[in-house]
Amino acid sequence: MLGKIALEEAFALPRFEEKTRWWASLFSVDPEIEHADKYGVGYQILSYTAPGVQDIWDPVEAQAGEVGVDRILSIDYPFETFEDAAVVLRRDVQTYGFIGALVNDTQRTGPMGNNQEEAYNINDYIAEQIRDKPDRFGAFTLSMHNPQEAGRDNAARLFERNPTGTIYEKLGAFRDYDAKVKAEITDINKLRIENASWDIFWQTDTEAQALAVEDADVWFDGAEFYDNAAMQYVIAYGAKQADIYGPINHWFEDRLLGLAETCKWLVGPDLSFAHGVSLHVLGMTVNGVFDR
């Protein structure tokens, strides 16, 4: 029985092979399935590796389209405000039976610098690659940029790809403030999901469940520990982020050295994601998000 689900399995576009070689391998369906079978993974949720849409600061450049094929969902919603994002989300929940999205950190700067067509290319590419394996692969992301043009394009492309509007994915995740790790950030609180600015997103989640959506779960994508600690330090003490990464990394590494042999496999994303997710949930709890 293949009872495991793998999240954020990275893929890249073939024409960016050189640029992404040191980030992640290119995506190939057959080897992925062979590897998944070997380790008991029944379903993989794919995520385009950096550099990608989520690494493009300019909203126009990052604007993306939405495609859906059976259980395949590949979404890049560019949004500028939480309110605008919720409007488009609510529309698609009601119109297309859309029940989920993964919100990624998509307003940070990155090395790619391509236009909105790049996002379309990414979605089109992965949709074609996994079209014949809807029971084994899914792909989706939700970008936080300007929605005006993207909303209309997304809906049109979704209908083009999947006339029935049938999309099967669980309700996605909300990644916090590392979307804007830039020197000009002065108020980290406005970018965290326990802030009241995010309430309209959680309201959309509630409405989706009220529409008899089954398994409308929330998946949290925890921020990296280094970004969390470094940015908190920047806000509190006004230091440049680059100046404090070294000490923070050394501090973290010192504590990792004390991990038991049985826990050494947690070093890296597993440990940092656990830290980020716990901050999300505890922050939402003490700030009354679940109560509201």
From Swiss-Prot:
GO terms classed as biological process: benzoate catabolic process via hydroxylation
Similarity comment text for this entry: Belongs to the metallo-dependent hydrolases superfamily.
Superkingdom per UniProt: Eukaryota
Reactions catalysed, as given in the entry: 2,3-dihydroxybenzoate + H(+) = catechol + CO2
Note: The MW of the complete protein is about 38 kDa (345 residues).
UniProt subunit comment: Homotetramer.
InterPro entries named in the record: Metal_Hydrolase
Top EC group: lyase
Organism encoding this protein: Aspergillus niger
EC number(s) reported in the record: 4.1.1.46
Keywords assigned: Decarboxylase, Lyase
Pathway noted in the entry: Aromatic compound metabolism; benzoate degradation via hydroxylation
Name of protein: 2,3-dihydroxybenzoate decarboxylase
Source taxonomy: Eukaryota, Fungi, Dikarya, Ascomycota, Pezizomycotina
Keyword match Lyase: yes
Record-annotated active site: C263
GO molecular function, one term: o-pyrocatechuate decarboxylase activity
